[in-house]
C-alpha cells in the first residue's frame, strides 16, 4: 500500500526497481565522481516512486552504517549530479527528482529481534 492507502501500481514498482539498479551501478562504479563521498560503499535498499513518477524516494545505507547521516546529506547536496548521471542510464521522458533518505529498516529489525530474544529468555 502506498501513501493514503492507495495500492502501488505495477508501473511504480517497475520504474522504482529500474532506478534502484541503475543507482546501484552508478555508486558501485563511482560514475558520478562525487567529491568527498565513498560511493562504492553505498547500498540502495529501496526506491519508492510517487504515483505521478515525478519523485523517487531513495533509501540508502552506507557500508557498515558509519557516517550515515553525513553520507545522506552529501547525496542530497549532489543529487543534481547523480540525477544527471542517471539520465544517461535510463531512457525516460521525465527523470524523477531524487530524494535520499537513510534506511533505518535494518536498525528497526535488529531492535525487534533483540526484544524477541529478551522475551524468550
Regions found by a protein language model. Name each.
Residues 1-55, 61-121:
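Charge-rich, low-complexity N-terminal segments
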Amino acid at each position: 500500500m502506498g501513501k493514503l492507502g492507495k495500492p502501488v501500481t505495477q508501473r511504480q514498482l517497475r520504474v522504482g526497481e529500474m532506478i534502484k539498479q541503475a543507482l546501484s551501478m552508478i555508486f558501485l562504479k563511482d560514475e558520478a565522481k562525487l567529491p568527498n563521498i565513498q560511493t562504492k560503499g553505498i547500498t540502495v535498499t529501496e526506491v519508492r516512486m510517487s504515483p505521478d513518477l515525478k519523485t523517487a524516494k531513495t533509501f540508502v545505507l552506507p557500508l557498515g552504517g558509519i557516517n550515515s547521516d553525513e553520507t545522506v546529506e552529501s547525496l542530497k547536496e549532489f543529487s543534481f549530479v547523480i540525477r544527471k548521471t542517471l539520465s544517461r542510464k535510463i531512457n525516460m521522458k521525465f527523470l524523477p527528482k531524487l530524494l535520499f533518505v537513510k534506511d533505518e529498516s535494518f536498525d528497526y529489525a535488529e531492535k525487534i529481534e533483540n526484544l524477541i530474544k529478551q522475551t524468550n529468555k
